[in-house]
């Protein structure tokens, strides 16, 4: 987008901002450009992002006074102006960064635990569940396990989750963890965010998301000890629930392949194996 158009959009939110340069962000997974720009200004750098109404609702409803999110300076006709967060993502995970992310997640989820009065804000259960239910017919021989996941999705306690909290949506800035891209944020089953954040971590150095197996295990245990235990959920029940939500993350690639008719992708081959392994572990072989 031309810088003059960017200036026009930003001026509708803050006429005092003087933009000197703009640079489009690129996606970590494929290098394509987002509709997100880093703006160099006469003072502090900013970010302009193309957004949607659920994301705007989430920022305004859950973070009016801040939180593990960028500070927002304004919205205008599908655009959001916010602070630029320097740092690095969780895509090359280390234990220190993981703890920062877990603490930020736990604090926000504790604040909004069982807040059903806020369920209509953003992309909560009422919007998410029907779309997940539609995937059932694409689950090949894994429908029974997927039905068990749907049962858990309906029944477990809910809290604030970013249901797209992939590692590149977690920025570590000093001693602060910041969560980005809240298009799929709202009051959802509690495991959604953690499962999304750690399910795809691999120990291969060239992996899209590098995370040691011991750190994945550590995250599951840390989350229980610092939040879920306090909510009265038995450990065994928690572990089974987390496995179902990990299964959902892997089965997403089965859905994508069957919905598109394209079974040639590496992710389909890899994650269908992992989904079946988890289903067997859960007793749905």
Which functions belong to the PLM regions below?
Residues 1-17, 268-285:
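Regulatory N- and C-terminal appendages and interdomain linkers associated
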Residues 17-40:
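ATP-binding glycine-rich phosphate-binding loop
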Residues 32, 43-80, 91-107:
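A conserved alpha-helical element in kinase catalytic cores
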Residues 33-40, 149-192:
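Active-site acidic catalytic loop and adjacent metal/ATP-binding pocket
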Residues 83:
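Conserved Hanks-type protein kinase catalytic core
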Residues 88-124, 139-144, 153:
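Conserved kinase catalytic-core helix
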Residues 193-231, 246-264:
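Active-site activation/catalytic loop segments of kinase-like enzymes and analogous catalytic loops
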Residues 231-245:
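All-alpha amphipathic helical-bundle segments outside canonical DNA-binding/catalytic cores
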């Amino acid at each position: 987008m031309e810088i003059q158009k960017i200036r026009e959009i930003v001026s509708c939110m803050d006429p005092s901002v003087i933009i000197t340069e703009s640079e489009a962000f690129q996606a970590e997974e494929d290098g394509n450009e987002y509709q997100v720009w880093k703006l160099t200004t006469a003072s502090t750098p900013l970010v302009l992002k193309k957004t949607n109404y659920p994301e705007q609702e989430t920022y305004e409803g859950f973070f009016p006074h801040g939180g593990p999110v960028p500070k927002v300076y304004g919205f205008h006709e599908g655009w959001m102006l916010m602070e630029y967060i320097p740092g690095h993502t969780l895509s090359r995970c280390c234990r220190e960064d993981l703890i920062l992310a877990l603490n930020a997640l736990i604090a926000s989820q504790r604040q909004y635990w069982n807040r059903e009065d806020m369920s209509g804000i953003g992309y909560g259960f009422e919007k998410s569940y029907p779309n997940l239910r539609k995937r059932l017919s694409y689950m090949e021989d894994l429908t029974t396990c997927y039905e068990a996941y749907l049962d858990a999705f309906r029944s477990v306690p809910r809290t604030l989750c970013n249901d797209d909290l992939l590692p590149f949506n977690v920025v570590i800035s000093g001693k602060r963890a910041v969560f980005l891209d809240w298009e799929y944020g709202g009051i959802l089953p509690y495991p959604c965010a953690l499962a999304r954040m750690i399910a795809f971590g691999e120990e291969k150095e060239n992996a899209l998301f590098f995370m040691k197996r011991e750190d994945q295990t550590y995250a599951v245990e840390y989350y229980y000890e610092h939040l879920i235990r306090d909510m009265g959920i038995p450990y065994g029940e928690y572990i089974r629930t987390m496995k179902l939500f990990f299964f959902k993350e892997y089965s997403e690639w089965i859905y994508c392949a069957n919905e598109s008719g394209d079974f040639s992708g590496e992710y389909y081959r890899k994650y269908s194996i992992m989904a079946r392994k988890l289903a067997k572990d859960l007793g749905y072989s």
